[in-house]
Amino acid sequence: MSNKPTVSQSKARSWRLCKQQYHFKYFLKLRKKRTKRPLKFGGIMHDILEVHLDGGDPLEKLAEIEDEGGKLFDEELEEYGNIIEDIETIFLEYRNYWPQDSWKIIPVEGKASEHEFEVEVIKGIVFNGRIDFLCATRKLTWLGEHKTFGQLPNEDHRWKDLQSVVYFKVVEMMGWLGKRQFDGVCWNYIHSKAPSIPQIKKDGGMSTRKLVTLPSVVRRVARDNNIDLEDITDIVERAEDSRHDYFQRIYTPINRSVVDFIWNGFIDTAIEIVDNHGKQSQMHVGKHCDWCDYEPICRAKMLGTDTDFIIEREYEVKENDNAKEETPKKVTPKRVVASKKNTRKSGA
């Protein structure tokens, strides 16, 4: 692990979005005591997808996570529902929906997914992080991102969410693709909503009301209530069709000039972070505040109420989520050339 100051994609995104958020998360190291369900779901799903792609037993991994979480999962049952059971159901359906030969995973140093990296991108600044996976379809090569969602992002959102293309440069620097170049990003979407449970009518039959659910859930309810599957073929078929709502892979081609443009912007942000870490904490109020972990603190500050009480009640100090991230220290950076066609001299 490098002793030089590090910058990650999450740090850059937070810095650009709201410096107050960055200050809370990466300078004060505040974290919510209770993780929101979407984040908890996404983290666990990432863990078992890693095991799945690497050829291990995802359900064994899920059982380990449940054992480790033990009491915490029990305490959150009323608020989140049985998140472990939901993840198991959704993952098994995902595995059936997308067989392993639906794409070709490109291994890196014998590993199929979750590729950690640490590379000096500016003299004195290290970029670190983790790439979900690399894959190929036909003759095209893609950088893969696992994304869990509550509402599927549309194309208008996806074209704005291009920050992951900075990983293109990292892969080139590391030489993981040889002479090949990426054609774009593969978004591997998985719906995080717990499948709805079909209702049983007074006569013992299954309600035909349309639900967003999955076939295995329908079959389980039918089995538990002694309902013959031949009597509910329409319900099962609808549930099978709804798998498309749960699992989508969308491939977004990326222009090489866009990669250089975003990369150079990332370098500028990295320099800003190193120069101003702990010094700037301007609040940027906007729609993003609705889902920001630190909204309660900012709201209390704006209303003139006790922020210390909010912090003590709802937050704790933790090291950064990525164990390899370190607190940036100011350096005098010298720019590394981002591309042969776009050379800029050093300077912050």
Question: What is the predicted function of each stretch?
Answer:
Residues 1-348:
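RecB-family 4Fe-4S metal-dependent nuclease core
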